Regions:
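Acidic/His-rich segments in extracytoplasmic proteins that coordinate ligands and/or metal ions
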Residues: 23, 55-134, 217-228
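Short, low-complexity disordered leader/linker segments with a strong preference
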Residues: 1-34, 267-269
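Basic- and aromatic-lined ligand-binding clefts that recognize polyanionic substrates
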Residues: 33-40, 44-48, 137-188, 192-200
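Extracytoplasmic ligand-binding site segments that recognize negatively charged/polar headgroups
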Residues: 95, 99, 107-135, 161-178, ...
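Periplasmic-binding protein-like
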Residues: 85-90, 139, 206-212
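N-terminal glycine-rich anion-binding loop in soluble enzyme alpha/beta folds
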Residues: 28, 34-67
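Structured C-terminal subdomain patch of bacterial secreted/periplasmic proteins
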Residues: 35-36, 119-122, 126, 130, ...
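Alpha-helical, coiled-coil/dimerization segments enriched in small aliphatic residues
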Residues: 51-76, 172-199, 233-241
Length: 269
């Protein structure tokens, strides 16, 4: 009889502990669903999504070619002040315009680093999720992003493109390296220099990866007309669930569509 009571007591305690853990997890998840998040651009919004945020709003319209140049308005400042969290990178013109005023809002500020490498995506998503208490949602989203890049890497290797020499825009080098491409040199984001043009003129570069937000690779084609050019983007054209992985998939698709013959081509995602 005594043994039965002990077993019964242990079962009751186990059930109570399980219920407590479930309630805590549900409470944490629920808390992350009720916060309002606003981001500076579609790129920082995409990181917010990977961090587990939903219904993220943006200040700079996603349709802009170079969103960081967006000039903030009084209405935008009011939107930021009403949000629980504002996610930004720091290089945006709006941050310079607001100056010290941004620190005087009622909004919690989260500054992140924007590059699309797997390592950075994991780090920034974890930073955001920690603040929003949205780790439960972030984990699967980051996993899906990594799968897109890893699958792209396999496709690049299958086509033999990992053996080709690449001259890459500095703002796109992170994804290029994660895809297993051989980056032999970089250019940008400033104007091309004489030495960079001379480097490509020597020959040996099979692919040039340019950046749609400030494309500057055209002069390189004049000195290396048989080199293939693909133009990638960093700022998603939409603000939605999975926007970064969808954009990266388009970048990968554009790369894989490059003709492998001698005809030059310029492909945009």
């Amino acid at each position: 009889m005594k043994k039965k009571l002990i077993v019964l007591t242990l079962l009751i305690l186990s059930a109570a502990l399980f219920a407590e853990g479930t309630t805590e997890k549900a409470t944490t998840s629920s808390a992350s669903r009720t916060v309002s998040v606003i981001a500076s651009t579609s790129w920082t919004a995409a990181f917010a999504d990977l961090g587990g945020a939903d219904r993220v709003q943006v200040i700079a319209p996603a349709s802009l070619i170079h969103p960081p140049e967006y000039e903030i308005t009084v209405g935008d400042v009011l939107k930021i002040d009403k949000a629980n969290y504002f996610i930004y990178a720091g290089y945006e013109r709006m941050m310079q315009s607001m100056g010290d005023a941004i620190g005087k809002t009622n909004t919690d500020l989260i500054q992140i680093t924007t590059d699309n490498s797997i390592q950075n995506v994991q780090k920034q998503a974890a930073l955001i999720a920690s603040s929003l208490r949205s780790e439960y949602y972030s984990e699967d989203r980051v996993y899906d992003y990594i799968q897109v890049v890893e699958n792209g890497k396999q496709a690049v290797a299958k086509k033999g493109m990992n053996e080709l020499k690449v001259y890459c825009h500095a703002m796109q080098v992170f994804l290029a390296k994660d895809l297993g491409l051989e980056v032999g040199g970089t250019f940008g984001p400033g104007p091309l220099t004489a030495s960079q043009i001379a480097e490509v003129a020597k020959g040996g570069y099979d692919i040039i990866i340019d950046n749609v937000h400030n494309p500057i690779a055209s002069p390189l084609l004049e000195v290396s007309p048989t080199t293939k050019v693909v133009v990638w983007r960093n700022f998603p054209e939409t603000v939605e669930r999975g926007s970064l992985q969808k954009m990266v998939q388009k970048n990968i698709d554009a790369l894989l569509k490059l003709p492998m013959g001698t005809n030059c081509g310029i492909l945009n995602p």
